[in-house]
Every structure is written in C-alpha cells, then in structure tokens.
C-alpha cells in the first residue's frame, strides 16, 4: 500500500494572471486521484480541505494522519465525507460496518477514531472519493444511500446544460460543521456544468470529474475571476481546486459527472453571486 498526500497552496487572483499552462495545472489540478491499493490525498490551504481517493484491493485501507495535522488521529478535529464511485465495498466506522455500493455516500463526524475501507472484489474494487474539512463539533455518523440524496434537476437541452444535482451532505438535510458534498450528472447531449457561472466568496470548492461517456471525452474546466478566466483540460477521474474568488464551471466533449465538495464559513447552498454572461472574459 502506498500513501501519499500532496500539498496545494492558496493563491490570490493576481497570481494566476501570470501562470502558463504547466504552472496552472501544477497549482490547481490533481491528475491522479485513484490507484489500486493506494491512498492518494491532497491538502489544500484553501479552507484546509483534504480530498482524494482510497482504492482497497486485497487488503483494507485506513487513512492515518496525525503528525501532519498536529493531532492524535485523523478525525480528531475533522469531519469526513465519502462517495463510492467504483465496485461494491464497505466502510467500518469505529467498529460499525456498512456496505457501500456505487453511488453510496457516508458522513463521518469529528472524533471518530478509525475508518477502514474495503472492497468486496479486488478485481472490481471500490473507489472511495473522500473529502475532509476542519470541524469544531461532533455530529452523528450517517450512511447516505444514493436513493436518499436530494435530487435537483437543472438546465435544459437548449442550453446544453440539462443535469441533475444530487445533494448528499447539505445543510437543508443534515447538520455538519462546514462540509457540503454531492454530485452532478449531465444528461446525454448536454456538456455545460454551472453555466451561467457564479462565485461564492464564503466557500471554496473542489470538482472531481468522472464517468465520462466515452474514453476520449475531455472536459475544459474554467476558473479564475470572471473577467480573467483560465481553463484546464481534464481527463477522467481528475480533480481541480477552485478558490472562493474563482468561477468554477466546465464543458465536455460528451456528457460526464462530477463530485463537488465545499467548505467555508457559510453553508447556505444558494449563497452565491451570479456572473452575468456579458462580464465573462
């Protein structure tokens, strides 16, 4: 088992005006999220979110972070959200085991001492996408089946953005310290997500793109200030960090899905500032 946690630092809007393609990708793109038998994480200084992939195969896996976070165990002062995008597996949370099929989620509160990830079949391993944010209070652990996710249809075919937003961890459904998490699925024939664009200065957000309709599907993710945008070309199962001052939207060559996760000082999902189309540059 390999464990690796990369670090991404925070940037001001002025910084990326001078980034070339290579530098932009180095600072905001996570090219490898899932690798069989490994735990691959990224720590971003944007609201101190940790995110990444856990892919157990023959053996179960456990995230063990202590010195890196100045704590005795990983979730001593953090909460954790999980969504499985792979084969069937399970999570053991302080001794309580829960089956996790594809699209199932889980919320794990501060103070949980042990979280163990396992796959039912090593040849078709579970792929657990995990997101952790700082916490100040313990909220109950809760399995989040896909069937219970709050579905919100958005967009239309005329604007190439017909999609459904599935809210797993959302303040309207459950209490957390700051974590919000869910995923969005675009319908065939649609390619745009989160367009018209918006910003939310009180929260940062990560996008992890996956379930591309075709092997050669690519997504161009847009970020930056509305009047100073940049793009990053993404492959399947890659993630991008969006600072709170940045737009975050994308367009694909076919349809796709992405997991979004947010944290910051405001949990109101609709607390956002819409960007008029004529202001985009």
Swiss-Prot record:
Essential cofactor(s): Zn(2+)
Keyword Zinc found: yes
Residues noted as binding Zn(2+) in the record, renumbered to the chain: 198, 200, 205, 248
InterPro entries: KduI (IPR007045), KduI/IolB_isomerase (IPR021120), KduI_N (IPR027449), RmlC-like_jellyroll (IPR014710), RmlC_Cupin_sf (IPR011051)
Pathway: Glycan metabolism; pectin degradation; 2-dehydro-3-deoxy-D-gluconate from pectin: step 4/5
Cofactor note: Binds 1 zinc ion per subunit.
UniProt record similarity statement: Belongs to the KduI family.
Protein name: 4-deoxy-L-threo-5-hexosulose-uronate ketol-isomerase
Organism: Lacticaseibacillus paracasei (strain ATCC 334 / BCRC 17002 / CCUG 31169 / CIP 107868 / KCTC 3260 / NRRL B-441)
Origin organism lineage: Bacteria, Bacillati, Bacillota, Bacilli, Lactobacillales
């Amino acid at each position: 088992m390999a464990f690796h946690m990369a670090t991404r630092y925070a940037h001001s809007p002025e910084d990326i005006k001078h980034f070339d393609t290579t530098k932009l990708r180095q600072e905001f793109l996570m090219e490898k999220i899932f690798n069989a038998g490994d735990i691959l994480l990224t720590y971003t200084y944007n609201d101190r979110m940790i995110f990444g992939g856990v892919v157990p195969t023959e053996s179960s896996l456990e995230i063990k972070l202590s010195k890196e976070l100045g704590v005795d165990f990983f979730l001593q002062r953090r909460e954790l959200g999980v969504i499985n995008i792979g084969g069937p597996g399970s999570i053991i949370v302080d001794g309580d085991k829960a089956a996790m099929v594809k699209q199932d989620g889980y919320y794990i509160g501060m103070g949980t001492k042990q979280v163990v990830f396992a796959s039912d079949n090593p040849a078709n391993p579970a792929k657990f996408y995990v997101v952790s944010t700082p916490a100040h209070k313990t909220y109950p652990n809760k399995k989040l089946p896909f069937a219970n996710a709050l579905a919100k249809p958005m967009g239309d075919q005329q604007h190439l953005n017909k999609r459904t937003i599935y809210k797993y961890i959302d303040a309207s459904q459950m209490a957390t310290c700051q974590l919000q998490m869910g995923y969005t699925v675009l319908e065939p024939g649609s390619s745009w997500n989160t367009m018209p664009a918006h910003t939310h200065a009180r929260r940062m957000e990560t996008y992890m793109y996956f379930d591309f309709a075709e092997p050669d599907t690519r997504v161009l993710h847009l970020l930056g200030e509305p009047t100073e945008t940049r793009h990053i070309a993404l492959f399947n199962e890659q993630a991008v960090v969006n600072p709170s001052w940045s737009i975050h939207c994308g367009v694909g060559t076919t349809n796709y899905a992405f997991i979004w996760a947010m944290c910051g000082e405001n949990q109101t999902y609709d607390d956002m500032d819409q960007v008029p189309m004529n202001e985009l540059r």
